[in-house]
Curated annotation (Swiss-Prot):
Signal peptide limits: none
Keyword list, A-Z: Aromatic hydrocarbons catabolism, NAD, Oxidoreductase
Pfam families with a match to the protein in the record: AcetDehyd-dimer
Top-level taxon: Bacteria
Binding-site list for NAD(+): S11, G12, N13, I14, S157, A158, G159, P160, G161, T162, R163, A164, N165, N276
Reaction(s) catalysed (UniProt annotation): acetaldehyde + NAD(+) + CoA = acetyl-CoA + NADH + H(+)
The protein's name in its UniProt record: Acetaldehyde dehydrogenase 3
Molecular function via GO: acetaldehyde dehydrogenase (acetylating) activity; NAD binding
Catalytic residues as annotated in Swiss-Prot or TrEMBL: C126
EC number from the UniProt entry: 1.2.1.10
Listed GO biological process terms: catabolic process
Sequence similarity: Belongs to the acetaldehyde dehydrogenase family.
Length: 300
């Protein structure tokens, strides 16, 4: 079966976990991993898996006689902003796992098919991938004037990049709650949980809804979205049934539905408690596979 060729730019933990997922894909063939540290564990693992590797950066990749069909980049926002126009000029589709947001933001259950033709798509944030689908599930049934999410992740799973970009995380996720989730106004909060042993990712999604909303339809919509996510993140699950509350002073006089989810990672390279990182690499793989299917069908 023909597969789309893939390069991974970045050789850190997320890139390495992504590599394991891509190796299992029926549609994607990882061929290259590019970094800047010749001693990185990611490059070493990639070499043992038969990939061509380089520590000379994106310039090396673009100078190769054969170019990948897709590139997955997990570096930093400023690096991807510099590289994105070079990928597009070379005819390489890009899946961006940084906060750069050069291309449209994508959440697979909500809006992936709208952007399969985009030269560059952005994976938003881990909190966004875990919670925006739930807001979307509610908003496709009723109007959602306000949605708020709280993402709690193991402190040890949050690297220096995450810690340095907490404000960017909240702003990007809040924007996604509105533009993709469908809420009129969105808010995001992230909590770094210092518990030891580490806790897996847990998220609370609060949506304001009309008082006369069809609660059964909302619950059904949430369950269908959860099933969609479980196709690529098996460890994604509801902690209990969605909880509905009548209007009260606490909720600003609005009825609400609150959903609790947890995300356990697959344990490919990252530990299972790092579901916040796992959902990013799993969602990116899903996006890449859908893009590859479209590319290969056009070529056929």
């Amino acid at each position: 079966m023909t597969k789309a060729s893939v390069a991974i730019v970045g050789s850190g933990n997320i890139s390495t976990d992504l590599l394991y997922k891509l190796q299992r894909s029926e549609w994607l063939e990882p061929r290259w991993m590019i970094g800047i540290d010749p001693e990185s564990e990611g490059l070493a693992r990639a070499r043992t898996m038969g990939l061509e590797t380089s520590a000379e950066g994106v310039g090396w990749l673009l100078n190769q006689p054969e170019k990948p069909d897709l590139v997955f980049e997990a570096t930093s926002a400023h690096v991807h902003r510099d590289s994105a126009p070079r990928y597009e000029a070379a005819g390489i589709r890009a899946v961006d796992l940084t906060p750069a947001a050069v291309g449209p933001a994508v959440v697979p259950p909500a809006n992936l098919r709208e952007h399969l033709g985009a030269p560059n798509v952005n994976m938003i944030t881990c909190g966004g991938q875990a919670t925006i689908p739930i807001v979307y599930a509610v908003s496709r049934v009723v109007d959602v004037p306000y949605a708020e999410i709280v993402a709690s992740v193991a402190s040890v799973s949050a690297g220096p990049g995450t810690r340095a970009n907490i404000d960017e995380f909240t702003k990007t996720t809040s924007r996604g709650i509105e533009t993709i989730g469908g809420a009129q106004r969105g808010k995001a909060i992230i909590i770094l949980n210092p518990a030891d042993p580490p806790m897996i990712m847990r998220d609370t999604i609060f949506c304001a809804i009309p008082e006369d909303a069809d609660r059964a339809a909302i619950t059904d919509s949430i369950h269908r979205v959860v099933a969609d996510i479980q196709q690529y993140v098996p460890g994604y699950r509801l902690l209990n049934e969605p909880q509905f509350d009548d209007p009260s002073v606490v909720s600003g006089g609005q009825a609400t539905v609150t959903t609790f989810v947890e995300v356990e990672g697959a344990g490919d390279f990252l530990p299972p408690y790092a579901g916040n990182l796992d959902i990013m690499t799993a969602a990116a793989t899903k996006v890449g596979e859908e893009i590859a299917q479209k590319l290969l069908s056009v070529e056929a």
